[in-house]
Amino acid sequence: MVHCAGCERPILDRFLLNVLDRAWHIKCVQCCECKCNLTEKCFSREGKLYCKNDFFRRFGTKCAGCAQGISPNDLVRRARSKVFHLNCFTCMMCNKQLSTGEELYIIDENKFVCKDDYLSNTNGKDSNLLSVTACSDPSLSPDSQDQLQDDVKDAEIANLSDKETGNNENDDQNLGGKRRGPRTTIKAKQLETLKAAFAATPKPTRHIREQLAQETGLNMRVIQVWFQNRRSKERRMKQLSALGARRHAFFRSPRRMRTLVDRLEPGELIPNGPFSYYGDYQSEYYGPGGNYDFFPQGPPSSQAQTPVDLPFVPSSGPTGTPLGGMDHPIPGHHPSSEVQRFSDIMSHHPGDSPSPEPGIPGPLHSMSSDVFGPSPSFTSLSLNGSGYSNHLSHPPSEMNEGTVW
């Protein structure tokens, strides 16, 4: 004989119900709260049967306002991690029902003040006010009860402030300003998961963020803010690396002065130099190497073809030892004017311009009479097709006129 699990009497009916692996009379399968018959679906807890509404009202998510259970068919509003009935989500001062998206201020985690009442009472002493944005949810299904506190919409929080910072003396003056919310500590394993997801997709979709929230256990808002900060950091690093590369290229590769030898080919004229000099110049008036007769020490070497090292200065004695460059000019003289004057002398026609006397000691003493005193004597040059007809001789008593043919 089969006995009923509800009334413990034998079942003599033609039909019976099997609930929780036990036999029941049809009339005994009813809600223990409202006593309604359960024909299609029932919920059980601790061996008792409940209808859907009574089960969620008693064991489901509680309203933060009235502390009663929320039915899956009820419309609710959310503020941070709290869920409220529509009728319970009201301002504590004016009892106005707050709508979706309206800015409000939280007092003691479950009491609200609308923005108008808060602004009209800014001299209040409560420093634990939190400014949030209300969010509504049309229904709560049984599958979403466990994730109710973690599932926060992207635009839920407008302005957050840390409740722990309310003990400061200046909180009364900073109530209307923007404050930082509580800081979230991300563990190493969670950080590795987020970095791997960022490497795959720097801008994840909402579906990907939901998966990351389930894997890491973090709030979706925290994940979204982490990705935003990470993208901003990547942009800053790229800008800094590009700027550093430009600075490195500018400071590590300056334009260095190179010698004239590196920039000139053999026989090329020195550009913009004070000496019009040809290495291997040939013409009908000057033979090969004719210009070298001017230098007592022979043609200048390639290592001494800079403007300051050219041994064009005549020697001070019969041995022909050069006096050196123009590194140490005579006090009171102007080397730049001397070089320019020498360039002007050398740039004229050889038959019409006098040449400096090689026997006069001292650098560039034959340049100008107004700088160095009385003008030295000059000698004439007679030119032919094979070169100079004679070398510079000792200074005669007067200047002679040369003939050119």
From Swiss-Prot:
Residues 179-238 bind DNA. Its main location: nucleus. This is LIM/homeobox protein Lhx1. GO terms for biological process: anatomical structure formation involved in morphogenesis; anatomical structure morphogenesis; anterior/posterior axis specification; anterior/posterior pattern specification; cell-cell signaling; cerebellar Purkinje cell differentiation; cerebellar Purkinje cell-granule cell precursor cell signaling; cerebellum development. PROSITE patterns: HOMEOBOX_1, HOMEOBOX_2, LIM_DOMAIN_1, LIM_DOMAIN_2. SMART domains: HOX (SM00389), LIM (SM00132). The keyword DNA-binding applies. GO terms for molecular function: DNA-binding transcription factor activity; DNA-binding transcription factor activity, RNA polymerase II-specific; RNA polymerase II transcription regulatory region sequence-specific DNA binding; zinc ion binding. PANTHER family: LIM/HOMEOBOX PROTEIN LHX, LIM_HOMEOBOX PROTEIN LHX1. Keywords: Developmental protein, DNA-binding, Homeobox, LIM domain, Metal-binding, Nucleus, Repeat, Zinc. It is found in: Nucleus. Residues 158-184, 296-373 are annotated as: Disordered. Residues 4-54, 63-117 form the LIM zinc-binding domain. One of its GO terms (cellular component) is protein-containing complex. Seems to play a role in dorsal axis formation. Residues 314-325 have a biased composition (Low complexity). Coiled coil: none annotated.
